[in-house]
A protein has these predicted regions:
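Short beta-strand-centered aromatic/proline hotspots
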Residues: 19-28
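Short, solvent-exposed secondary-structure boundary/capping segments
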Residues: 31-38
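Intrinsically disordered, low-complexity, charged/polar segments
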Residues: 39-67
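Generic short amphipathic/hydrophobic targeting helices enriched at N-termini
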Residues: 2, 21-22, 33
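Short coil-to-beta transition motif at edge beta-strands of beta-rich domains
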Residues: 1-16
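Residues that cap or initiate secondary-structure elements
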Residues: 16-18, 41
Length: 67
């Protein structure tokens, strides 16, 4: 199971919600990582957070990739 590194840019896909989020990894945990959200595309609509304080979690075995 691949793991990102802190400060790497990633893309996190959630097909069930028709959502893809991109952001920078800020913390690694035992089975998941936390990333700062830079952009979210949900159901074809792009959303960019006004501030960079929005964070999300992703399990290592979810659909994600380095960008």
């Amino acid at each position: 199971m691949a793991k990102p590194e802190v400060n790497e840019m990633i893309e996190h896909s959630e097909p069930y919600f028709e959502r893809v989020a991109t952001g920078k990894v800020i913390e690694l945990l035992d089975s998941q990582f936390i990333y700062e959200v830079h952009k979210v595309v949900e159901k074809g609509r792009e959303k960019i957070p006004v501030d960079k304080t929005s964070t999300r979690m992703c399990m290592f075995d979810e659909i994600w990739s380095k960008i």
